[in-house]
Amino acid sequence: MSLQSNQLVLHDDVHPYLLNATLFTDYAHKLRTITIPEGHLVTVNSEGSLNFPVGSIISKTFYYPKADSGVLLADDDGNLFKPDAGTRGGLDLTKVRLVETRLLVHRQSGWVALPYVWNNEQTEATLEATGDIKSLELVHGPERRRFPYIVPDQNQCAGCHGTNTASKSINPIGPKVANLNRNGYDDNQNQLDAWQADGWLELKGN
């Protein structure tokens, strides 16, 4: 990801995706992406979970649509990510407020959770291992309310993604075959089929 002319844009090797089932997070919209190291494949195990190679990065950016006045909106109408903007699509920062980006990075030692928080100027995101609390004001219909938006710390991220309490290892929980089996941002093609055609996903044996 990078910032270009008031757009948060994706690089060529960053793949945005949508899920069939998602969690509610204080009306925040989410831009989800997968980055796979060049020359490697994602495979699928017998349970329908994806096996990501070391060096993979899964990101989730939380943002809110905003009115011309700058007020944040509790708006569930569609996704504001535009696939045809920038290199691989983008978010128009004149229309949205970025709050946080959570990364899962696959290292040789396993997955690591890294929470990043965007500054008020929307110019950079800083790693906040201890989490953060943002005071946000949100308009929902005729109502306006201020609330504490909580960015989880690394331990809380690991707690949600923990799959083995003994080893304390963590794993991705959202991107599974069943949850990804739908059209993506290109509404004319199933995203799993698109990824196979692009040569970085192998579904054999599933």
Language-model segments: what does each one mean?
Residues 1-34:
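N-terminal pre-domain segments of enzymes
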Residues 42-44, 67-69:
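Short, solvent-exposed loop/turn elements at domain surfaces
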Residues 31-43:
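Short, structured beta-strand/loop micro-motifs enriched in basic residues and often containing a Trp
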Residues 52-55:
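Short, well-ordered loop/turn sites that connect or cap secondary structure elements
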Residues 46-48, 160:
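Short, conserved secondary-structure segments in the cores of folded domains
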